[in-house]
């Protein structure tokens, strides 16, 4: 039986209805779902799970769109685990992470990466996203993936700079991608072409106006590899503070990170079951980062589990999820469901999970730190129970400065060097001048 991560205590009634309490926990080799209103205690349980997993040497990751959880978490890493840590602070302008999604992708993986990037942009722009924009972006990413020394910053240049486009297309062999650029894009009337690419240009321009995003995704060199982290029980902590870098950049980075971990899991198909080291990724405010439709996400959860990637999806309220189908797909595919205090609307959606033992009034009236939970046991659905989450773990190690310095050294580049290379790449081509003969 696997060793459980301790969460707190649960109410237990003996045969004569005498109330007692016993400890309860979760197996990290399960998907999980955590919901709770602001101030209900949700962040504390995520934090305690992460600290225990790190202390035990588990492969663990965290995507934090607020920033406080990630900043706090690195203070609990013992010195023996510092070599395992990749700490990614998107607001660290001095040392941007060297992360190039397009670098060294095998040909059979390139379509998956393309769809992941397109899905992240689609998720970000929602209602303002159009078919033609998606069509152009898909073919741009596919072309850049086939070429050497490219990054996502090359998309706009590919659209507007013919010499650069020619240098990229000379390396593309996929007939469908080549057909788009030569038989479609190049044949468009110049005015129509400008109208067609303008929405994508505007969206890219708004995103890459952020120095944080530009300096991370605009690097050609890649030092960040989710597959290596997963296979070696790494510790990945991503701080994506929306208040500092903006909603758009934070959501895009989170969506791309989630996509990359999903793709890294799928790459394990060629590895034997015994070599698929379990890795658990905890995602706070996960609706900001989802790129799949409901049916596709249900498949994603099943595939991830098969290849040793387990997700805990946490958020505040169900209105953040844009369809009941997606909500049901999640509830049907997770082993552990933990509900803190929720609104009346959310209680109506969740009471089927905990019925008949617990209903709407129970979910609405929980105190801070109280939960109603359903935990899978030995592969079978558990019986719902009321519990109390343990208080915050307090044993800080005090090595945050060392962890930040080590992650900068191993996974990042100095800002001045990054910006020098990006400036050189984006510099306009020199104008041709005629020689004047005297």
Model-derived segments and spans:
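P-loop NTPase motor domains
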Residues: 2-17, 25-27, 32-40, 45-309, ...
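H-loop/switch region of ABC-family ATPase nucleotide-binding domains
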Residues: 315
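P-loop NTPase motor core of the ASCE superfamily
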Residues: 2, 23, 123, 128-132, ...
